[in-house]
Amino acid sequence: MILTKPVPLYPPYIDLCDFYLDDYPELDKIFSSNESWWLEQFNWGKIFLTYIGRNKSSHTYERFRNDVERFLLWSFIEKKKPIDQLRKSDFLEYADFCWQPPVTWIGTSNQERFKITNGYSSANELWFPYKMQAPKSLKAEYVIDKKKYRPSQQTLTSMFTAVIAFYNYLMAEDFCIGNPAQIAKKDCRHFIIDSQVKEIKRLTASQWEYVLDTAVEMADENPILERNLFVIAALKTLFLRISELSERPNWSPTMGHFWQDDDENWWLKVFGKSRKLRDITVPLDFLPFLERYRASRGLLGLPSSNENSILVEKVRGQGGMTSRHLRRIVQSVFDQAHENMCSSEGKNKALKLKEASAHWLRHTGASMEIERGRPLKDISEDLGHASMATTDTVYVQSENKKRAESGKRRKVD
């Protein structure tokens, strides 16, 4: 079976842990009818991704899977050369390929990799290695031209990060003797040295007011939507990442993770980025939102430290919610808030609500606290940043403010 177009290679981590080629007849046929190194290097990818899935977050697994999969597909279909024989020039050629892949490798929507047919997994024909979507605020009128696909600088950096890590793993296991991706990175012509002033992706005070008021109105009208209000309030007020509210294989957020110290201060214990466990201060203004969400679930008062009720519970089914489901909740509130603000204030003032993602709530909360004058060190610790310098760079931008202030005094004459 000659492979002329890309097919998915690796399933989700939970399925990869119990992976047998017999369950994937198409892949089995592809590997049995092509050169032996295809299967060998597919297995290298499988071993590496199993390691990543076991030791890193689900988000990191998915990101590394995307990049390892693309790299192997390119080596099979386009380069026709084993990855342990690639040199620096070959990898720079791959970087060019990633910068402008063939339109036949580009899709326009999120798709599952595999579908189940008669008990076996087969490739989803609607899946493609690369994805090009309309900007969030322009989806209705945007026409997608795949020829104009270009990865962002972040996507390009992520590709190098993943493939360099892949090669490092293969070197440690004695499968490879060099890392062409590492050597090629500094000579990749598509990287841009970015020294721009970064705009914080956040909502204005007015936009946040519409989001909160909308969430309150929705919850008042339908008790099931108390969950939406709680999620919105928690992400903004407690500076949470969406994953920190989600159910994960190694962490299940519970009501008991809210706790009170001897001075009656409230805290929330979260399992965050880089497997870091931290405690976040919980302001008094947030407690009524916690209480009303608990009341909607039949839980009385504020949580006790030994309470094991799921923090954000599914309405149907058991257990906590995934990051994907939580994002949908946030998006539903943003959409309604955008509609409300458009009606009252006009489209221009509401535009950011069309662009916003769940992570903007974390940025919004932190930015507002800085404007309020709260000590940067305290905000940094609540955010879970490794250093206060990170918080300053992202939110305060002290040096840029000094430069802007001094720049105002320049004269024309």
What is the predicted function of each stretch?
Residues 192-213, 275-285, 302-307:
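DNA breakage-rejoining catalytic core of tyrosine-based enzymes
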Residues 328-381, 385-388:
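Short, basic (Lys/Arg/His-rich) helix/loop patches that form interaction surfaces
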Residues 164-168, 228-247, 268, 368:
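Short pre-functional
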Residues 393-413:
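DNA/chromatin major-groove-contacting recognition/catalytic segments
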